[in-house]
From Swiss-Prot:
Glycans are attached at residues 139, 217, 329. InterPro entries: FN3_dom, FN3_sf, Ig-like_fold, Kinase-like_dom_sf, Prot_kinase_dom, RTK, Ser-Thr/Tyr_kinase_cat_dom, WSC_carb-bd. This is Putative inactive tyrosine-protein kinase Wsck. The protein kinase domain is predicted to be catalytically inactive. GO terms for cellular component: plasma membrane. The chain crosses the membrane at residues 402-422. Keywords: ATP-binding, Glycoprotein, Membrane, Nucleotide-binding, Receptor, Signal, Transmembrane, Transmembrane helix. It is a single-pass type I membrane protein. It comes from the Eukaryota. It comes from Drosophila melanogaster.
Length: 791
């Protein structure tokens, strides 16, 4: 068979290609095609486009048309007989058979320039490299970007002015795709994106697990096989693209109500953070609350005050504040009902003076024409006043004010003098009575060991009892010398705000002033004279373990101690928001597309922070013994803080004491004193499950009896796997719930496993609500988590 030359730009048949290869190998060196000769890439034959007819120019050859379109910055040169068009878009579904482009070009009859109802497309990129051509973004979402590029075929690479194909020296093997973050709004730690390898025949690839509203630089490298050097890079292309803006996260702190009149409410707005895009606007929402029935407002019906009156709904948008400048996002005060216009809404004065009002917020994030809004509903906590909300009486200038101040000073001075006299008299009588009856007034009784569960942070089982009150105070003094001493006048106590009660005494709130800076704090109030021998030993044990701990970012800070002759204060950092409450309040009702306002990344970050804190306690040989979601707190910047001293705080304003039996390991439920780091791992997994279950109650289908709970655990009952929690994460929890303590994972293992899952959070769990499906959130039953009351 004779090897004839091929005319035109159509693909060469297989047998002709083989003949051409043999001829090229037999040519002398001087007859080889020069490498610097210009070449162009023939894309294919496509359906004629009518929108290009009014922009045509005259061109006799593809090379002339390519040069014109390249000069104008277009991606493609389109030929139809002697007419030349330029285009940037190519529709793959409009590709036709190569044989339909049969009209020969005027200046070179060996080439074809379109046909009847079809056009010939050429790439304007003059190259012989098989890199990806016309790299573009074909689709994007919050967490993904879809890349597309033109398919490369070596048989379509033609010499300028000729019709023969340029045979490549390299064979395209695959593509390597990598994305790098250039700009993001997120303050969360960024994890490096993996490199993906796709086959050379692919022309599209979807990058997933990306962060919303983040600018990425995406590079696609072509890897070729060479007979001499093996695999090497033979071309590349890159593009910058931004993912869609996501639903604002995290949930902002609710506004604090400073004061109220009949027509206005003054609130304080804290700085707001958004990890899923820019913070464009802030909506201030007024909601009239019915205490008998409190339901979330419907975002579809949310509008202006006039629209609320027409629809008959008890909520409306009072203001739309601009937050697109850095100076806007700060602590600021705002008056609801001042009658002014903010953005698209008028801030109407309140028309129900006696009604209970909640102020909610709406976070609006807009990027590249896409807008997402997240609503944070106000609660009763925004009405709680703090120690900063005191108002002081003032007097008018004049003689009346001088007289009033003088009378006040005399009265209070007399009361102070009488108090001092009574104090020294009672102290004299008490000391004299002790000397008469002896130093040790404890009744001598035979006591047997009693095992009971302690509601404090650590349980003491074998500590020796102090021999006398003097010995106890001596040991206490030695421990206290290692702590920072805070003078009593640096403390401001809120004695009516009792947030917990345990064996050692009550826990109240207050403020501590150090270095001219006042901070909120919680104070464990101890009356040392009221402690018996066993409680004294337990207190010494806890203080010894507290002295072993240094400052750790995920433990509540210990500020120091303050002592007086009658009272002893242990001062800790104050955090009001418990993890349990934060998880439950984050739940969203239908028709919201999400089950929660929290992101998957944040929930995994919380589990990692908690595991890191427990690993630190384990390294210090400290056993927590009462780890649960009620002993973990969430800060204003969405970091976790673990309480390591004292009783659990009350669950609600009714002062219900939490019962953490549902978080205990089976050996602790059975013996009540077999606490260890391995039993803490069991509790850690229960709290991690709560994070995934958005505050669900562990073993919600079991009663509160310890014996029945123990029997259920022995029967292989574990907290159920929610439908949106995937196998890898749930298996990590199951490894912590082994009956044999030695077979459980360590806190370090849990932290390492969660860290790996954080590289792809949505492969571990997904809070997206399934369309048409039922809510699968585990139930939250607070009555099962509280200590049962008698009667």
């Amino acid at each position: 068979m004779e090897c004839g030359s091929h005319s035109g730009h159509r693909p060469i048949p297989i047998w002709l290609s083989s003949c051409l290869v043999a001829m090229c190998l037999g040519l002398p060196l001087g007859a080889a095609v020069p490498q610097e000769a210009p070449a162009y890439y023939y894309v294919g034959c496509y359906t004629a486009r009518t929108d290009l007819l009014h922009e045509s120019v005259y061109a006799k050859t593809p090379q002339t048309c390519i040069e014109i379109c390249e000069h104008q910055g277009h991606h493609y040169a389109v030929l139809a007989s002697e007419k030349c068009f330029c285009a940037n878009v190519l529709e793959p579904q409009e590709q036709q058979d190569e044989q339909l482009c049969n009209t020969r070009c005027l200046a070179n009859k060996a080439q074809y320039c379109g046909g009847v109802g079809v056009h010939s497309y050429y790439s304007t990129i003059l190259t012989k490299q098989p890199g990806p051509h016309h790299l573009r973004i074909s689709n994007k979402t919050e967490n993904s970007l879809t890349l597309s590029w033109n398919a490369y075929e070596a048989r379509k690479l033609l010499l300028a002015g000729g019709a023969e194909a340029v045979l490549p020296n390299q064979l395209l093997d695959n593509f390597l795709i990598k994305a790098q973050v250039l700009k993001t709004y997120s303050s969360l730690p960024a994890f490096p994106q993996p490199e993906f390898m796709v086959q050379s025949t692919e022309t599209q690839f979807e990058l997933t697990d990306l962060h919303p509203a983040t600018l990425y630089n995406i590079s696609v490298r072509a890897m070729c096989k060479d007979a001499q050097v093996g695999q090497s890079e033979c071309g590349q292309a890159s593009i910058e693209a931004t993912t869609e803006v996501g639903l604002p996260s995290p949930v902002p702190a609710q506004p604090k109500i400073l004061s109220r009149t009949d027509r206005t409410v003054t609130i304080e707005l804290s700085p707001i953070r958004n990890d899923n895009g820019p913070l464009s606007k802030l909506l201030v929402i007024v909601e009239y609350v019915d205490n008998a029935l409190s339901q979330p407002f419907d975002a579809q019906l949310l509008g202006s005050w006039q629209q609320a009156q027409q629809d008959g709904v008890p909520y409306y948008i009072a203001a739309e504040l601009d937050y697109d400048r850095p100076e806007d996002n700060r602590t600021r005060r705002f008056v609801v009902g001042d009658g002014k216009r903010y953005g698209r809404f008028t801030n109407k004065p309140l028309d129900q003076p006696d009604a209970h009002v909640h102020i909610s917020l709406g976070l609006v994030s807009t990027l590249e024409g896409v807008t997402k809004t997240m609503y944070s509903r106000g609660t009763h906590d925004q009405h709680v006043t703090s120690l900063d909300d005191f108002s002081y009486a003032t007097f008018e200038k004049g003689q009346s004010s001088v007289v009033a101040l003088a009378v006040t000073c005399v009265i209070f001075g007399s009361c102070l003098l009488l108090s001092l006299i009574a104090y020294f008299y009672l102290r004299y009588k008490t000391c004299r009575g002790r000397r008469l009856t002896g130093g040790n007034t404890h009744e001598m009784t035979l006591q047997t060991p009693i095992i009971e569960r302690e509601n404090n942070g650590y349980l003491v089982e074998d500590d020796p009892l102090p021999h006398s009150p003097e010995n106890f105070k001596q040991q206490l003094q030695q421990l206290v010398e290692g702590y920072e001493r805070i003078p009593r006048n640096a403390l401001r106590l809120n004695v009516n705000d009792v947030i917990g009660d345990g064996r050692f005494g009550e826990i109240i709130t207050g403020k501590v002033s150090t270095n001219d800076f006042a901070r909120d704090c919680t104070l464990h109030v101890l009356c040392l004279d009221d402690l018996n021998g066993t409680t004294q030993a337990q207190l010494l044990r806890e203080l010894r373990q507290l002295s072993q701990l240094k400052r750790q970012e995920h433990l509540l800070d210990f500020y120091g101690v303050s002592a007086s002759p009658d009272w002893f204060y242990l001062i800790f950092e104050q955090q009001r928001m418990s993890l349990k409450r934060k998880l439950v309040e984050s739940r969203l009702m239908a028709p919201s597309p999400r089950l929660t306002s929290l992101s998957e990344q944040l929930v995994l970050q919380w589990i990692y922070e908690l595991a890191s804190a427990m690993n630190y306690l384990s390294s210090c040989q400290v056993v927590h013994r009462q780890l649960c979601s009620h002993s973990v707190f969430v800060t204003s910047d969405f970091k976790l803080k673990l309480s390591v001293f004292g009783p659990l705080p009350y669950m609600n304003i009714a002062r219900q004491q939490p019962d953490h039996n549902r978080w205990l390991a089976p050996e602790v439920l059975r013996h009540q004193h077999h606490h260890s780091t391995r039993s803490d791992v069991w509790s850690l997994a229960c709290v991690a499950w709560e994070c995934c279950a958005l505050g669900g109650t562990p073993y919600a289908n079991a009663v509160a009896s310890n014996q029945q709970l123990l029997e259920a655990i022995r029967a292989a009952v574990r907290p159920a796997q929610p439908a949106y929690v995937y196998g890898d994460l749930y298996q990590l929890l199951l490894n912590c719930w082994q009956l044999e303590p030695s077979e459980r994972s360590s806190c370090e293992d849990v932290a390492f496993g969660v860290r790996q899952l954080m590289t792809s959070p949505r492969h571990a769990l997904s809070f997206d609500r399934v369309a048409g499906g039922l809510d699968t959130l585990p139930p939250y039953l607070p009555q099962l988590e509280a200590v049962a009351t008698m009667g």
